[in-house]
C-alpha cells in the first residue's frame, strides 16, 4: 500500500497582470503572452511581493483548453527571492471563457483552473519549497490572477 495523499494550504499569490499580447495561431493553438507586473504573496510565515517582471505564456488550443506556463519571481519581506515556474490548465464553458477574454467577471467556481507551481531559491529558510510538490487552485480576474497554493503532503 502506498502513502495516502493529502494537501495543506500554504499561501496565496495574487499576480497583477497587464494587457495580453498575441503571437497568433502557431499551428496547434493561439499563443498569448500576459505580462506579470507585480502583486503580493501571503501565508503563514510567507509574506512579500510578486516582482514586476515575468509573464504567463499561454496556448489556447482549438478545443478551448488553455495551457498555462507562467514564470516570475517573489521577493519576501526578509529579502529572500524565490523563482516560480507555474504550469497548469484552464477550461470551462466556451461562453464563460469568452467573457474572461473580454475581461468580464466570471464566477471562478465555474472555471477549472489548476496549476503545479515549482519553486527555486538559495535561501535556506525556504529550501523546503524545492523539496515538496504543490498544487494551485487559481482564479482569473480582469487585472489579476489569484492562486491558492497547497502543499502535497
Question: Language-model features: where?
Answer:
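Beta-strand-enriched cores of mature, soluble protein domains
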Residues: 1-153
Amino acid at each position: 500500500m502506498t502513502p495516502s495523499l493529502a494537501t495543506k494550504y500554504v499561501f496565496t499569490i495574487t499576480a497583477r497582470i497587464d494587457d495580453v499580447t498575441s503571437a497568433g495561431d502557431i499551428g496547434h493553438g493561439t499563443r498569448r503572452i500576459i505580462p506579470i507586473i507585480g502583486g503580493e504573496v501571503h501565508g503563514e510565515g510567507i509574506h512579500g511581493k510578486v516582482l514586476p517582471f515575468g509573464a504567463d505564456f499561454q496556448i489556447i488550443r482549438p478545443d478551448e483548453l488553455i495551457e498555462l506556463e507562467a514564470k516570475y519571481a517573489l521577493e519576501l519581506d526578509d529579502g529572500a527571492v524565490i523563482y516560480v515556474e507555474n504550469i497548469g490548465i484552464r477550461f470551462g464553458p466556451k461562453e464563460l471563457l469568452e467573457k474572461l477574454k473580454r475581461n468580464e467577471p466570471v464566477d471562478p467556481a465555474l472555471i477549472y483552473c489548476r496549476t503545479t507551481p515549482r519553486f527555486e531559491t538559495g535561501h535556506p529558510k525556504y529550501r523546503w519549497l524545492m523539496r515538496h510538490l504543490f498544487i494551485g487552485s487559481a482564479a482569473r480576474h480582469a487585472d489579476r490572477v489569484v492562486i491558492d497554493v497547497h502543499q502535497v503532503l
